[in-house]
Amino acid sequence: MFTKVLVANRGEIALRVIRACKELGLETVAVYSEADRECLHVRFADDDVCIGRPPSRESYLNIPRIIAAAEITGADAIHPGYGFLAENAEFAEIVGASNITFIGPTPQQIRQMGDKASARKIAQKLKVPTVPGSPGPVESLEDALKTAEKIGFPVIIKAAAGGGGKGMRVATDPEMFAQAFNLARQEALAAFGSDQVYLEKYLARPRHIEIQIMGDTHGKVMHLCERDCSVQRRHQKLIEEAPSPAVDQTLREDIGEAAVKLAEEIGYVGAGTIEFLLDEDGSFYFMEMNTRIQVEHPVTEMCTNFDLVKEQIRVAAGEPLSFVMNGHRLRGHAIECRVNAEDPARNFQPSPGLITAYHPPGGPGVRVDTHIYAGYTVPPYYDSLLAKVIVHGNHRQEALARMRQALDSFIIEGVTTTIPFLGRVLHHPDFLAGTVDTKFLEREPHLLKEPT
C-alpha cells in the first residue's frame, strides 16, 4: 500500500479522495491554484502545495508542477479525480515514469478507450452492439455525406477525441449536413486539438444508461449495475439514479455482461464507466467508456454499500478486488442531484461569488458531497458544481420523497443555484413515472424558468 497520495484535483472530488485516503491510513497532499487557497481540500490534507495562477492550464492542467509537488512532498501515488488530467494518457505516462503510481488505468487503456473510434472498433470486434455509424473517422465532407446517406438521416456528427457535449452536431437532412459537419470539425479542433469526427445514427428518444465497473491487476473485472443519467442539458448530466426505472433484471445482466466483456478485453484496471444508449424498443448500444471515477459514483455506493474510491486506491496498490458482485446485490434506490452555481433561466449562466449563507440538508439516507461553506467565494475559473445531494430509500418513491425534502431544506445564499430548477424536475409527471429520456429538457423548456 502507498504511504502518501497527492490529489491532482480540487473541489468536492478532492475532499472525497482525501476522506478515502484517511480511512485507509494514508497521508494526503493537496495541490491548489491561487484562487483556491481557502478551499477545504487544502485545509484537510496533510500537506499542500500551490501550483500556480487561477487558470487551469497554469495550475490543475500543469503536469510538470503537479509532478514537482509530488516529488517535493514525497507522494508515492497520484489520484487524478475526474476532469482536468483524469483521462490524459500522457499524464498517466509521466506519473509512472517519475516512479509514482497513477491511481487509474494504464496509459494504453486510457488511449484505447479515450479515442471513441478505437473504442467502437473494440466493441464491434466483441459483438457488443454499437449505434450504426461510420467504421472510424470520416476524412472528407464527400465521404461523410455518402456514409450519412447509407446510415440514414438523422445523423449525429461527433468529435473522435471528444466528450462533454463538445464537437457534436445533428443533421436531419442532406441540405444541412455540410454546415453541421464543418461546425463539428471546428468545435472538435478548438476543444480537443483534433478535427477528426465520426458519424452515428441519431436516436430520437434514448435513455443514457451506464455501467460502473471495477478491475484489478489480477485480471478480475466486476460490474456494479447501472445508473440512469437521462436528465441532461447539452450532454451534461444533471440528475442520476440507480437502478434505472427502465432496466429489468434480464436487461441488467445483458448490459452488464457487455460492459465486463469490453473491460476484460483490454485488461482494465481501476474504476471505469461504460456508457450505453437505450432505445425505446429495449435495444442498447455502446457509446463510450470513461476511464475514471465519475461525478455520479455515489448513487452506486449508496445502492451497493461499496466505497468505490477506496477500492480504486486498493487495486492501484495491487490488491485484489475486495468484493464479488456482478449485478445481483442492489439495495433500494438512490438519486443524485447536481447543485451548480448557475442560472437555468439564463441558459445556465455561471453565478460565481460569495456564499453568504449555507445550510445542508440531513436526515436518514441523505448524503451531501460538497466543498463549500458560508464565507466561501465560488471562483469563476472552474466547473460550477457546488454540491451533490444523494439520497437513498428502500424504493424509488421513498428516494424521491427524500430528495424533494432535501432540496427544500438546502439553503445556499449569495449565488444563484439550480436547486429550484431541480425541484421542478422532480415534480414533473414524466420524471415521477420514470419515463424521461435525454431529450426531456428540450421538450420541457418551461422547467428552466420559475413559474410566474
Model-based region annotation:
Residues M1, G164-G165:
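An N-terminal boundary/leader segment
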Residues K146-I156:
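Acidic/histidine-enriched active-site and ligand-binding environments that engage anionic O-linkages
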Residues M1-L126, V138-K146:
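ATP-binding N-terminal substructure of ATP-dependent carboxylate-amine bond-forming enzymes
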Residues V7-L26, D48-C50, E71-T73, A89, ...:
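ATP-dependent carboxylate activation and anion-phosphoryl transfer catalytic cores
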Residues G133-S134:
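Conserved beta3 strand of the protein kinase N-lobe
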